């Protein structure tokens, strides 16, 4: 089998602030969890690599949100697969569904790093344990390109706390996206939905580090860059593309839909 499938239910902690829907960041975390479970079936989980003085890192995520996101308690299905392996790089593609319809899809770039040198390890063992499925959800593994900023939109500072860190003792991926999300004004998020997120992780940061996140407008409407820096050096770059929410994207319409299904 060259695809791994896992189902989840949308829980309270993963809902957005307004419409009882799954937060986009939570969709990414479900995908990351599914990948971790997939690697465990091949004895390549984080704890397996720890014994060989290595660890997984994700370098990039690129994800499209193509339909309204599922509501609280609904079941979602994630399919994830290894789509490409080079000498040092590992690409995964993934698709998220609910009610048998795709609501998000994308890809991620991974490396296995040596703990001592912090350099990528060769991927020979992966080609032995994983089957390759060359199905590309976004058509290609697009290189991350940071658009030119035209003006600063918002800017905040954040000091990493205990809840930002993971078992590797560095700041986790979710926290960087949360920091960027905090720069998006409340009124904007009420009226717009996230259409695409492309993120590049550049450096690790740790407990107690102070980060600055600057969100910028670009030449394209509804496209923004989010630059997260430590001491003036970028640790994470994010590009987001947004669109106006549809009329169906509210809890009243959802309740009517559920009522009609029961009749």
Please state what every model-predicted region is.
Residues 59, 90, 195:
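Exposed loop/turn and edge beta-strand positions of beta-sandwich/beta-sheet ligand-binding modules
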């Amino acid at each position: 089998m060259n695809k791994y499938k896992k189902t989840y239910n949308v829980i309270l902690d993963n809902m957005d602030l307004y419409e009882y829907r799954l937060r986009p960041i939570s969709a990414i975390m479900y995908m990351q969890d599914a990948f971790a479970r997939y690697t465990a079936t091949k004895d390549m989980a984080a704890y397996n690599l720890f014994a060989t003085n290595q660890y997984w890192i994700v370098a990039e995520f690129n994800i499209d949100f193509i339909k309204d996101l599922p509501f609280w308690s609904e079941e979602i299905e994630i399919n994830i697969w290894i789509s490409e392996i080079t000498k040092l790089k590992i690409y995964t593609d993934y698709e998220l569904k609910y009610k048998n319809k795709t609501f998000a899809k994308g890809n991620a770039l991974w490396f296995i790093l040596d703990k001592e040198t912090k350099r990528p390890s060769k991927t020979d063992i992966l080609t032995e344990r994983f089957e390759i499925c060359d199905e590309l959800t976004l058509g290609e593994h697009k290189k991350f390109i940071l658009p030119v900023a035209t003006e600063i939109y918002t800017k905040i500072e954040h000091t990493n706390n205990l809840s930002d860190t993971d078992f590797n003792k560095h700041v986790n991926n979710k926290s960087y996206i949360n920091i960027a999300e905090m720069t998006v004004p409340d009124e904007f998020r009420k009226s717009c939905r996230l259409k695409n997120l492309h993120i590049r992780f550049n450096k690790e940061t740790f407990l107690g580090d102070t980060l600055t996140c600057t969100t910028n407008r670009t030449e394209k409407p509804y496209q923004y860059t989010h630059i997260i820096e430590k001491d003036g050096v970028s640790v994470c770059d994010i590009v987001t593309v947004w669109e106006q929410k549809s009329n169906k994207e509210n809890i009243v319409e959802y309740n009517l839909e559920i009522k009609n299904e029961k009749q």
